Design a protein with these regions (language model features):
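Metal-dependent phosphohydrolase cores
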Residues: 1-170
Length: 170
């Protein structure tokens, strides 16, 4: 029998989320919607960039969030994007619902506590716009999401509808 190390166990819940049938369904819809998109996309490269930036900021600022929680929130933060493209439903609202559905149906042994689920859903819901009284997890994901974008070298930057505050790299 192969022994699972502590390091390998560290991301098993992340794998359970990414391999979840509901996640795969909505992730594929995003990919379909963005096939010919010239602006920033919301696929795995972006999701993992957000995760890495958030984790670095978490360490630098001593926020104390768990690494796996950050990565799970990152892969879920744009999961509602196809609803924004197809039905004009803000992706953070649709995404929070989808995230909750996934988190509530993970197999035994891969579940999150209620507190962890609440933090992940707050990151998904609060990452899009800066607002007064942001919680640390919302601020972390707002900043990480914006910093993940390469506006400085983007060929479509002039046509982009992001305001100057959002174009942090500019």
């Amino acid at each position: 029998m192969k022994r699972v190390t502590e390091r390998q166990k560290g991301m098993l819940r992340l794998n359970a989320v990414v391999n979840h049938e509901v996640y795969q369904t909505y992730y594929k819809r995003i990919c379909e919607c963005e096939t010919d998109r010239v602006f920033c996309c919301h696929q795995m490269n972006h999701l993992l960039d957000v995760a890495r930036i958030a984790y670095i900021k978490n360490l630098e600022e001593g926020l104390g969030f768990d690494k796996e929680l950050i990565y799970v929130a990152a892969v879920l933060h744009d999961i509602g994007k196809s609803f924004q493209y197809r039905q004009q439903i803000p992706h953070e609202i649709a995404g929070e619902r989808i995230a909750r559905r996934i988190l509530d149906s993970l197999p035994t042994g891969f579940t999150f506590t209620d507190e962890e689920k609440a933090l992940i859903c707050l990151a998904v819901r609060g990452h899009r716009r800066r607002h007064e009284h942001m919680k640390p997890i919302e601020e972390l994901f707002y900043e990480s999401d914006k910093r993940s974008r390469m506006c400085l070298s983007c060929m479509a930057e002039k046509k982009c509808n992001w305001n100057e505050e959002e174009k942090i790299w500019r």
